[in-house]
């Protein structure tokens, strides 16, 4: 985006352009995760973090009365390492797993493709828009 004048750009729009611009966005161009990427996230180092999150989620679900329908949304699932471990952990709690609808909010088509490959045969749903204020 080239301009000859100074433009006030709100931070959220700057971040959105930097990360998700269709031509040059950071998460659009490549997979930045893992040993070949720019950084490694906790689920890629050890299962422990994701397993602890899973235990907390199941505990929370029980504390609110074990509802028959429960949505769990992961925002920006990266290479799906956490969701993969969450699913494995949730399967150890069949009543919870039966009630849980797993959703990934992902804007990047590149990462969504990686996630779908990693979570093949998993009952996960994807969304790319939560709401709009316009």
Task: Give short role names for the model-derived ranges.
Residues 1-75, 79-129:
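Rossmann-like AdoMet
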